[in-house]
C-alpha cells in the first residue's frame, strides 16, 4: 500500500497526505503548489 505524503510535500489529492489535507500554498518563487498540510 502507498505510504502517505508528509506535511509540506507536494501532493495531488487530500487522500495522499498523512493529514488527509492537500491545499494550495505559495512557494518562495510566488508559484502556487498543492502541498500537504
Curated annotation (Swiss-Prot):
Pfam families: Omega-toxin. It is found in: Secreted. One of its GO terms (molecular function) is toxin activity. Disulfide bonds join 4-18, 11-22, 17-36. This is Omega-hexatoxin-Hv1e. The presence of a 'disulfide through disulfide knot' structurally defines this protein as a knottin. Belongs to the neurotoxin 08 (Shiva) family. 01 (omega toxin) subfamily. GO terms for cellular component: extracellular region. SUPFAM superfamilies: omega toxin-like. GO terms for biological process: defense response. The lineage of its organism: Eukaryota, Metazoa, Ecdysozoa, Arthropoda, Chelicerata. The record marks 10, 27, 35 as: Critical for insecticidal activity. Keywords: Calcium channel impairing toxin, Disulfide bond, Ion channel impairing toxin, Knottin, Neurotoxin, Secreted, Toxin, Voltage-gated calcium channel impairing toxin. Expressed by the venom gland.
Amino acid at each position: 500500500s502507498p505510504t502517505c505524503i508528509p506535511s509540506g510535500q507536494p501532493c495531488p489529492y487530500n487522500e495522499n497526505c498523512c493529514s488527509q489535507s492537500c491545499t494550495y500554498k505559495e512557494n518562495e518563487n510566488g508559484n502556487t503548489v498543492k502541498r500537504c498540510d
